[in-house]
Amino acid sequence: MKIQNIYHLLQAALLLLLVSCTQEEFPAVQDKAQQLTISVTDGGYTSAVENMKTRVETRAVENGYTTEFTEGDACGFYMVRGGKPVYSNVKLTAEKDAATGGIMWKTDGTTLAAGMDGESYYLYYPYQADMAGKTATPAEGAVMTDAEFFKPLIDGWQPGDDQSTHAAYTASDLMTAGGSTTGTGNTIHLSFAMKHRMALAVIEMPKTVYKFIDANVPDYTVGAEATFTGTAKPLRMADGTYRYLVHSSMPTIEGCYDGGNREFTITTSASHPVVGEYKRYKVDGAQAMAVSYTHLRAHETCADL
């Protein structure tokens, strides 16, 4: 009986010792972390022509060359602490905030917490389920830029040949960013300003400008519609231009307009493509031909011209 009592006492003492070690030597690191909220914006494309003149780090973004994220867009999130991954390729999906009408980013069920020392945050778009071998491994204590962290992904990225739909175009528009944190208390806000990792070719077509004799009717401009005959299929924009994303080299873009009567070929210049920059390529000088027009008939609109 005495032996059994001594045995039970030893068990209890050992259990207390283990609990003591756990509390003192293995603190719950994650308990000190705070919940994350995330916002994502796009830094846009800059003009290759203007950058050749200035080449400054700060950049003014032209309207129309930024991406507005919409409901359903998805990014991949990474967090590294002390050189070791904490979160890897967590899917963040854009959802509409019913209260504000803005965009908020939701995880696929993972609760994100951060705020410890030695953390770095990385984001890329568009999301890919398979990211094996597409990120670099930072050395312990080292801090990588997003370009360094995602270098394998960027180097191996190939924009699609056919970018003629909005979905196909955005699927080719690789962006990455490093995160910066603000906030105190129980919630940390994490902001990402995305940088485009491809170059952008903007194709301008010749235009027809309808000038109405009636001064109350403003001029109406119509860009020629192109048919692309090669493998490269750019996306037509609302302003009549075409856009095509390229990597380190641009393929020859071939096409025709005016019912097939006029053909054109576009090849890259020596100064383009450059990552994050756009350059305009003007077919036949993108000249505007003026046509005088007396008036619109009762049943006509400018779109009928």
Region spans (language model):
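Single conserved hydrophobic/aromatic residue that forms the stacking wall/gate
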Residues: H295, C302-L305
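Sec-type signal peptide cleavage vicinity
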Residues: I3, Q11, C21-R297
